[in-house]
């Protein structure tokens, strides 16, 4: 992976650039609490991924550098605001279209890590659930129902000793539904620590008191895909380490 000379991205102050390749592929390490894209009004906001205007019709951010030159960042997928980790975009619409096709065809290999409750009855392996979206008091909620099939391969990596009974798990989803991993964990009674919608609220408060950790402990840690552009095969891989506060739980 090579970084190339590029205009400075007007990134959220807690996010950072991981890669900007000659092919136009851009990878950003998004901080927890940052929106992948703005709310419908499209206005600049300190909680947005980029401090720039967002053009909804073209799914891109646009800004002008000090020399008066206009630049764009085309968003290729999204992460929930509470989730941290790798988010992919492109500096040009052609590359963005190719990447979006890979996401749509489920040809992107994604790996997440999460800290969850420990439940001896929960099983690792291949998780399959049918989930539906609902509106409850105007807020989006996802639950088991007669909806799209959601799949993920899951491994339990490490258990923390102590009364909180926490564990680190790896999740590799082959589908990308809204709130999918959070709900799949909740359905197996191992909710993700810090989840303020589907979580164990008592445990969340306890972890916050003990570790000062007040966020969803879900991190997009690895992404891999290939695209063919102008006859050339381009393979892209990117990693993002666990945020320090999450990693400290197991040290």
Each language-model region and where it sits:
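RNA pseudouridine synthases
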Residues: 1-151, 158-163, 233, 241-250
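Hydrophobic residues in beta-strands and at strand termini
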Residues: 30, 116, 156, 171-173, ...
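Beta-strand secondary-structure signal
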Residues: 88, 113, 128, 153, ...
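Beta-sandwich strand segments
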Residues: 192-193, 233-235
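Generic N-terminal initiation segments characterized by hydrophobic and/or small/turn-forming residues
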Residues: 210, 239-242
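A contiguous, mid-protein "functional segment" used to position or interact
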Residues: 230
């Amino acid at each position: 992976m090579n970084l190339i000379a590029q205009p400075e991205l007007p990134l959220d102050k807690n996010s950072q650039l991981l890669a900007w390749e000659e092919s136009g592929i851009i990878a950003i390490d998004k901080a927890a609490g940052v929106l992948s894209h703005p709310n419908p009004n499209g206005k600049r906001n300190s909680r947005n991924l980029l401090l720039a205007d967002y053009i909804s019709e073209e799914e891109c951010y646009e800004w002008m550098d000090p020399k008066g030159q206009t630049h764009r960042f085309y968003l290729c997928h999204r992460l929930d605001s509470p989730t941290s980790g790798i988010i992919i975009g492109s500096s040009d619409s052609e590359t963005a279209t190719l990447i979006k096709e890979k996401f749509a065809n489920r040809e992107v290999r994604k790996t997440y890590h999460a800290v969850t409750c420990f439940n001896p009855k929960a099983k690792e392996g291949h998780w399959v659930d049918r989930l539906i979206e609902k509106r409850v008091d105007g807020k989006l909620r996802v639950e088991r129902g007669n909806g799209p099939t959601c799949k993920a391969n899951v491994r339990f990596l490490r258990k923390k000793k102590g009364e909180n009974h926490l564990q680190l798990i790896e999740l590799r989803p082959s589908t990308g539904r809204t709130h999918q991993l959070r709900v799949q964990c909740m359905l197996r009674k191992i909710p993700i620590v810090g989840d303020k919608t589907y979580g164990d609220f008592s445990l969340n408060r306890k972890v916050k008191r003990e570790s000062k950790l007040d966020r969803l402990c879900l991190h997009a840690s690895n992404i891999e895909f290939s695209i063919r552009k102008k006859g050339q095969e381009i393979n892209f891989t990117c990693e993002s380490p666990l945020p320090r506060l999450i990693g400290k739980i197991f040290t």
